[in-house]
């Protein structure tokens, strides 16, 4: 009886360890470092294409069920924070000469949305997602700071082997900037909404 009890305990321990080990292969946490290509536009004005941009993202995937067929899981992605910075160079040509100046634009946001993860082989993970990204967007232009709430959406996919991988993401949204510190009247904001549309490529670390 004693030997049977020890055998059952051993089998249970091995089963639990195997389940934990298998679950660990489904990486939940992610840290992304990316570069951005984006366009900022307003009705009636020329589109502005970025000079360069960068991003930093931290989040986690919450899986909704055990693996289907051992290879497929659906989940909810929660990005705790996503920081994006974009630099624009503007050349203003007039009769009297050419002026060069810059816009600095950025967002701080959180994301939430559905995702799908496929693990066809042991360490290979393919992850696809679409997220709603409420943001605070800021713009420094003409020696003035502007900012406001912005609505963004992001969608993309990544492929990783073990801890490290590569990803691609499209992002789009709009914002009506207002001068920070002003009384919020119409003269202190841009006349039209500013639209942002672009993509990012990123290096991802999953744990």
Question: Where are each of the predicted segments found?
Answer:
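Transmembrane beta-barrel architecture of outer-membrane proteins
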Residues: 51-57, 105-111, 149-154, 196-200
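Membrane-embedded beta-strand positions of outer-membrane beta-barrel proteins
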Residues: 29-35, 72-78, 112, 128-130, ...
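Short glycine/proline- and aromatic-enriched beta-strand/turn motifs that initiate or cap beta-hairpins
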Residues: 20-65, 196-207
